[in-house]
């Protein structure tokens, strides 16, 4: 798992109490095919909160799929099946980097505008991908309840996810994006107002 790709979205959710006068609507849970520890690409060990079979999908706002070189594993097919069910049930699905390749292999990208590391990446590594006409060359693409991003698009991906979930006002989301993309303190002040 590429933990660097989910840093901004985790930061945005962790700030919710601070930015919403003490209220918190969203809780992040880590989910995997089982509860075995996962070694990330950066060398961190993450212990999932729950297995995919334990998730109550009637009570989630989003399923976010980080990049990973392990998406091709048979173990992850249940997660991809759940992603497809989420999309059918108007639950937001976010996929970045290698997770977009997994969605391509599963046929999901054949029905949504999307992006990935490149069109060539999807064509080369996926034998089943047929969504070429829906590919958009951008860091992040939001279409209905699917948000996809390339490996360099984690900040834009975060912005699109926050807007889709209405976590914050557009003004706060823009301040978050502008602060983390420029480092300009005026946007941090706007974020805290």
Task: Give short role names for the model-derived ranges.
Residues 2, 8, 15-34, 49-94, ...:
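Active-site-adjacent pocket-lining segments in enzyme domains
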Residues 37:
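Lipid deacylating catalytic domains
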Residues 42-50:
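Short gly/ser/thr-rich secondary-structure transition/capping motifs
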